[in-house]
Amino acid sequence: MAKAKFERTKPHVNIGTIGHVDHGKTTLTAAISKVLHDKYPDLNPFTPFDEIDKAPEEKQRGITINIAHVEYQTEKRHYAHVDAPGHADYIKNMITGAAQMDGAILVVAATDGPMAQTREHVLLARQVGVPYLLVALNKSDMVDDEEILELVEMEVRELLSSQGFDGDDAPVIRVSGLKALEGDPEWVKTVEELMDAVDESVPEPVRDMDKPFLMPIEDVFTITGRGTVVTGKVERGKLAINSEVEIVGIRPAQKTTVTGIEMFHKQMDEAWAGENCGLLLRGTKREDVERGQVVVKPGTNTPHTQFEAQVYILSKAEGGRDNPFYSNYRPQFYFRTTDVTGVITLPEGTQMVMPGDNTEMTVDLIQPIAMEEGLGFAIREGGRTIGSGKVTKILA
């Protein structure tokens, strides 16, 4: 039995299964878990189908989503795999997703070929910035005709290319999740091949720690005799004491130097991604900064007011609006730590948006906010969440 030793130094990669309902996403997820468990028992517990299928509910930015998280390891990597059973859950996770995927396995049943939701999922993956797709041609055990398999593969490749993915070179692996789950050696091998392809082809993500420093400001206060302190959770990067920073968003950008870093009342030399800390700012007055701005490495982030977004609007049952809205609707957009009013323009041909819909839109904010493509936000009305979205393109 091949034994891989557990190393914390392994790269961590977030992936997921996407594709049309009933094409076998959850069965394949369970099969991956089982095949890797059998291959590396020390590294992987087996997560059975029914555990993934009854995906637990979780809340992301006020929206309830049923989603299953499965962890497993290959020899090279540690994976966190998300599987959203329902089509609506999948869409909600893509748009609001805390689980940002570094790559996804597009599951297409060889018996059906690409269907409506296959197309919708690929389009959405492109819009929300999933960087890489590869294909599992599932249920291949049920198709005897090689020509049909080749046709389906061609169709899937064309679909990927049409949405800006690498349709020519993306790995397309013929698998049978069900047969692999039953332990059929021929089909177990195909799932091993699929995971080798995931290892080789899904690019390793840049870790949060290696990105330029960014901390959203949650609170501002004055320490007598020392100056102004801003607190928040470091979103990415790291910052050493005496570094120059820029404060961006809402008002004109200003530069200052961080003369002290404090965490849980202890002095620190550095602030790292994921940590809650206070930054002491040289020569900055209490009234110069406010919640909703961000502290960044100079020159790495600019404030914007106009952007395109992909948005999910809550249904009435989820606590959303009870009626549709139209262009020129002016709700609040909650970015990181603050609400800013924005004016919505719906795409041509869309008259109105109903609760429960997902849509594209253009937004004009009344104040500039530090943002980049892929940034998530909530849409709020009178303090309650009515929608959630991601910035897909910055316009101004």
Curated annotation (Swiss-Prot):
Gene Ontology cellular-component terms for this entry are: cytosol
**EC number(s) given by UniProt:** 3.6.5.3
Residues of the region (G3) are: 83-86
Q: Which UniProt keywords apply?
A: Cytoplasm, Elongation factor, GTP-binding, Hydrolase, Magnesium, Metal-binding, Nucleotide-binding, Protein biosynthesis
For the ligand (GTP), the binding residues are 19-26, 83-87, 138-141
Q: Name one Pfam family in it.
A: GTP_EFTU
Domain tr-type G residues, every copy: 10-206
What GO MF terms are annotated?
GTP binding; GTPase activity; translation elongation factor activity
- Which portions of the sequence form the region G1? 19-26
Summary of the function given for this chain in its UniProt record: GTP hydrolase that promotes the GTP-dependent binding of aminoacyl-tRNA to the A-site of ribosomes during protein biosynthesis.
Q: What is this protein called?
A: Elongation factor Tu
Q: Which organism is it from?
A: Beutenbergia cavernae (strain ATCC BAA-8 / DSM 12333 / CCUG 43141 / JCM 11478 / NBRC 16432 / NCIMB 13614 / HKI 0122)
Lineage runs:
Bacteria, Bacillati, Actinomycetota, Actinomycetes, Micrococcales
